Design a protein with these regions (language model features):
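Conserved N-terminal phosphate-binding loop of PLP-dependent enzymes in the Aspartate aminotransferase
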Residues: 1-258
């Protein structure tokens, strides 16, 4: 067992059941064009829909987590008509240009030049050392600053965040995400959780958001979804966001055969 392994080894290295399933699939159907589907993809989608919290029963697969983040950002624009986002400083959502725009690590942003417009950032609610020196677990200073940014910008389409900071394993205050969910609902802002490295049982529950009794509008998963052998990710949303059937939200060559 590798407790790091880039967060892909929930079932260890080369688990026999995963290896055998991949071999069987290669014998049956090694590739599926993106314009079609296949029974294996359908079965996986149904399984994830059954496991997912709330109404997150619609999904689109992608060949990697960064790709799925890009799909979430595009869907948020289609759904709200707004392009602005709020995300956290020091967060990580991938290394592509759109992902580092919403990400907050200087390692990926430094000297790159102009990033995506409308990518607003706020400090994360770190326990005991947050930017606003909040005196207790309520983190009123962090919440009030979020409200301030929402009010001043006025046209935020989505808030995207890691419900649990994974690189440094930052545990958020228990009620923080409930308060964020309320702010999003009051301002018609979509809440997107990036659980690419943390979902699928790594925290004792299938999804991190279940620890906080909060269901996002979109949930992005990946890494361990590919069994530690091949890259795979998925964007899960509720059925109200199934609105772009006539457009290429993903359109990745291997989105149906990853």
């Amino acid at each position: 067992m590798d407790f790091h392994g880039n967060s892909v080894h929930q079932v260890g290295y080369g688990h026999p059941r995963v290896v055998n399933a991949i071999k069987d699939q290669l014998d049956q159907l090694p590739f599926c064009p993106r314009r079609y589907t296949n029974q294996t993809a359908i079965d996986l989608a149904r399984k994830l829909a059954k496991l997912s919290p709330g109404r997150l029963n619609k999904m689109l697969f992608a060949p990697g987590g960064t790709n799925a983040i890009g799909m979430a950002l595009k869907l948020a624009r289609y759904a709200t008509g707004r392009h602005k986002t709020i995300s956290m400083w020091d967060s990580f959502h991938g290394a592509s240009l759109d992902a580092i725009s919403i990400g907050g690590e200087s390692l990926f942003r430094k000297d790159v030049g102009p990033l995506m417009p409308g990518s607003e950032h706020i400090p994360p609610p770190r326990r005991g050392k947050c930017h606003f020196n909040c005196p207790d677990e309520n983190h009123d200073g962090c919440i009030e600053y979020l409200k301030y940014v929402v009010e001043m910008e006025g046209d935020i389409g989505a808030l995207i965040a890691e419900p649990m900071r994974w690189t440094t394993v930052e545990l958020p205050p228990k009620n923080y995400w409930k308060r964020v969910r309320k702010i999003c609902d009051e301002n018609n802002i979509l809440l997107i959780f990036d659980e690419i490295p943390s979902a699928l049982g790594r925290t004792g529950k299938m999804f991190v958001c279940e620890h906080f009794d909060v269901v996002p509008d979109m949930l992005v998963i990946g890494k361990g979804l590919g069994g530690g052998i091949f890259p795979m990710a998925a964007l899960l949303v509720h059925e109200d966001l199934d609105i772009v059937g006539d457009r290429a939200l993903g359109h990745y060559t291997h989105e149906k055969s990853s």
